[in-house]
């Protein structure tokens, strides 16, 4: 997912180019504006954390581009491509990562990345109801 700062900062096409050049296929994409209820549900696992209200406010501050990416080892390769959560640290340790390119800090870090294959499956289904479990589980690659 390209977060509001990535979309409003006009990084969308640049990020998509990086994604494709890294060997991913963009299977589905959807530009959407999250409301408070949707953002809260998507990030529900963080609801008890102190940063949760700020996260929901940020994620509803502008449109996001949700993508389904496909590639063998997609989740781990995507995590490598986006870099560390904190964009300031990414600029030092992973200067060619997406977060180093367009992120500002640990929240405004331009992109979201699933942390596991099971999270990827849940997150894909959250936004793309037409994707069924077998579509993901039986593929010869991961999707996120």
Curated annotation (Swiss-Prot):
Annotated residues for binding of ATP: 3, 51, 79, 85, 99, 109
Organism of this sequence: Arabidopsis thaliana
Keywords (A to Z) from UniProt: ATP-binding, Kinase, Nucleotide-binding, Transferase
Active site: 112
Classification via PROSITE patterns: NDPK_LIKE
Family from the record: Belongs to the NDK family.
Enzyme Commission number(s) of this protein: 2.7.4.6
Organism domain of life: Eukaryota
Catalysed reactions, as listed in the record: a 2'-deoxyribonucleoside 5'-diphosphate + ATP = a 2'-deoxyribonucleoside 5'-triphosphate + ADP; a ribonucleoside 5'-diphosphate + ATP = a ribonucleoside 5'-triphosphate + ADP
Signal peptide: none
Function field: Involved in the synthesis of nucleoside triphosphates other than ATP. The ATP gamma phosphate is transferred to the NDP beta phosphate via a ping-pong mechanism, using a phosphorylated active-site intermediate.
Segments forming a coiled coil: none
Lineage per the UniProt record: Eukaryota, Viridiplantae, Streptophyta, Embryophyta, Tracheophyta
Record GO biological process: CTP biosynthetic process; GTP biosynthetic process; UTP biosynthetic process
UniProt-recorded name of the protein: Probable nucleoside diphosphate kinase 5
One example GO MF annotation: ATP binding
């Amino acid at each position: 997912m390209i977060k509001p700062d990535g979309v409003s900062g006009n990084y969308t096409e640049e990020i998509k180019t990086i994604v494709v050049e890294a060997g991913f296929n963009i299977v589905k994409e959807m530009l959407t504006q999250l409301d408070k209820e949707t953002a809260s549900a998507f990030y529900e696992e963080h609801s008890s954390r102190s940063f949760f209200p700020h996260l929901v406010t940020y994620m509803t501050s502008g449109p996001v581009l949700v993508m389904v990416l496909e590639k063998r080892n997609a989740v781990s390769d995507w995590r490598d491509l986006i870099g560390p959560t904190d964009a300031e640290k990414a600029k030092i340790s992973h200067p060619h990562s997406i977060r180093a390119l367009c992120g500002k800090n640990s929240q405004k870090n331009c992109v979201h990345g699933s942390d596991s294959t099971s999270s990827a499956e849940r997150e894909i289904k959250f936004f793309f109801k037409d994707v069924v479990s077998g579509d993901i589980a039986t593929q010869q690659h991961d999707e996120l």
